[in-house]
């Protein structure tokens, strides 16, 4: 523990392949006395160089996430509540790294999440399957009459992918999710992974198609989210294409589009 003039916290937290300058980050986002934690792929040591830092400030504010760019690095800033009850959100806090928590309030919340891990995971899986059913039902009812029917089908497939990922105790992470799905052990449930990826259409991934998808996904994000998330989308799609991860890029762009389509 290192003391600074504004607060008591670690100057740096080092993970497998990067170090996070906590002191400068907390000053940059001006968190005051609220607990702060980091989740996402960076927290689980499987992030790519293009991945952002997912930072949650537990200030209880009901506002959309924002994007911060600092020294060429992107931070996705979320606002959370210490009294959160939604399994979809609590799941994102599982195994979170505490960056600032003088009153141990966040530590207590994370301890409760750990105790109820199985219940939270099961609730999330159930919610995903319900959402998948709704999407498929909408596609079926509007097939041939609605130009969005195919979008509903793909959205349903992504919800099923979320459920399969969670059944395998892997928190959904769109940039890395296809890789994880491929690596899961064989089982009756995991046999549906092939059906999911075929429904999404990852075999169609080509550099030219991905360039068009990237542009449309960024534009859709700007229209729906209005928080500069499109900059992260552009950086990730560029990285994945340049590293020949075409199917992963297709899956990622489709996942982001699904989220905004549902919104």
Question: Where are the regions that the model predicts?
Answer:
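Residue-level signal for well-ordered alpha-helical segments
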Residues: 3-6, 13-15, 32-34, 105, ...
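Generic alpha-helix detector with strongest preference for long hydrophobic helices that associate
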Residues: 3-7, 37, 84-87, 106, ...
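Glutamate identity and glutamate-enriched acidic tracts
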Residues: 8, 27, 52, 65, ...
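Metal-dependent nucleotidyltransferase catalytic core
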Residues: 2-100
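Internal, well-ordered alpha/beta segment that forms a basic, Gly-enriched binding/recognition surface
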Residues: 75-139, 144
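Intrinsic-disorder-associated interaction segments
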Residues: 3-4, 8-15, 99-106, 118, ...
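Conserved nucleotidyltransferase catalytic core and NTase-mimicking acidic/glycine-rich helix/loop elements
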Residues: 123-263
């Amino acid at each position: 523990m290192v003391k600074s003039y504004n607060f008591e916290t670690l100057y740096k937290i080092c993970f497998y392949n990067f170090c996070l300058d906590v002191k400068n980050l907390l000053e940059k986002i001006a968190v005051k006395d609220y607990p702060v934690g980091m989740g996402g792929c960076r927290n689980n040591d499987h992030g790519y160089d293009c991945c952002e830092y997912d930072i949650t400030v537990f200030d209880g504010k009901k506002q959309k996430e924002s994007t911060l760019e600092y020294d060429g690095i992107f931070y996705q800033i979320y606002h959370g509540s210490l009294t959160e009850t939604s399994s979809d959100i609590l799941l994102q806090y599982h195994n979170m790294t505490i960056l600032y928590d003088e009153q141990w309030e966040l530590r207590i919340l994370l301890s409760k999440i750990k105790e109820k891990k199985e219940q939270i995971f099961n609730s999330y899986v159930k919610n995903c399957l319900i959402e998948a059913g709704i999407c498929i039902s909408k596609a079926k009812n509007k097939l041939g009459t609605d130009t969005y029917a195919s979008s509903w089908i793909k959205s349903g497939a992504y919800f099923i992918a979320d459920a399969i990922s969670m059944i395998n105790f892997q928190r959904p992470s769109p940039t890395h999710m296809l890789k994880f799905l491929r690596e899961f052990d064989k089982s009756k449930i995991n046999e549906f992974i092939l059906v999911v990826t075929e429904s999404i259409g990852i075999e169609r991934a080509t550099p030219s198609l991905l360039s068009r998808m990237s542009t449309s996904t960024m534009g859709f994000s700007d229209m729906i989210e209005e928080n500069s998330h499109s900059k992260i989308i552009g950086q990730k799609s560029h990285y994945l294409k340049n590293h020949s991860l075409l199917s992963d890029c297709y899956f990622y762009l489709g996942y982001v589009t699904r989220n905004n389509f549902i919104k």
